[in-house]
């Protein structure tokens, strides 16, 4: 799966191909329930249910299926100076066997102290990769996700977000 923001680093041709693949894969499932039923690994299913419960509690929203099996909660609008415009989920995750990706649309950089207490994980610009939830401290993960959710909601309350929040200023 290509996460939001990664398309900007790819060439135009690659973006079109990947975008088309995302649409085809996302069309395989009519609902979150159908997607969850397609997961075959018991650990992934259990971890996904826990994350759905956590993110519903934080956002007050049901999960929505975004491209290729990403489960997102709530949404915000963005509009960049480049003219690119769209909607994204505020918090979400992508379950795969052996690696769950938790998305923080404001990035991981501002959470360094909490991430140090999280447990076994790896990070990139706006992703936390976790092999299984039993490897991390769930209250710490919930605190990180809650702070990310509140920040994105505060940034988008007066209109579209006008920059990629997880990228550092140049």
Region roles according to the model:
Residues 6-7, 13-170:
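Charge-dense, helix-prone N-terminal extensions
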């Amino acid at each position: 799966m290509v996460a939001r923001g990664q398309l900007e680093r790819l060439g135009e041709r690659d973006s079109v191909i990947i975008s088309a693949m995302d649409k085809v894969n996302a069309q395989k499932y009519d609902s979150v329930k159908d997607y969850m039923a397609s997961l075959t690994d018991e650990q992934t299913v259990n971890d996904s249910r826990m994350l759905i419960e956590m993110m519903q509690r934080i956002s007050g929203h049901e999960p929505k299926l975004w491209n290729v099996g990403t489960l997102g909660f709530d949404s915000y609008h963005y509009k960049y100076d480049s003219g690119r415009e769209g909607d994204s989920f505020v918090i979400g995750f992508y379950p795969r066997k052996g690696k769950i990706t938790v998305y923080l649309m404001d990035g991981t950089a501002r959470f360094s102290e909490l991430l140090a207490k999280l447990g076994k994980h790896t990070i990139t610009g706006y992703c936390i990769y976790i092999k299984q939830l039993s490897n991390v401290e769930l209250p710490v993960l919930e605190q990180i996700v809650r702070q990310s959710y509140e920040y994105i909601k505060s940034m988008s309350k007066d209109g579209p977000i006008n920059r990629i929040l997880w990228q550092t200023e140049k």
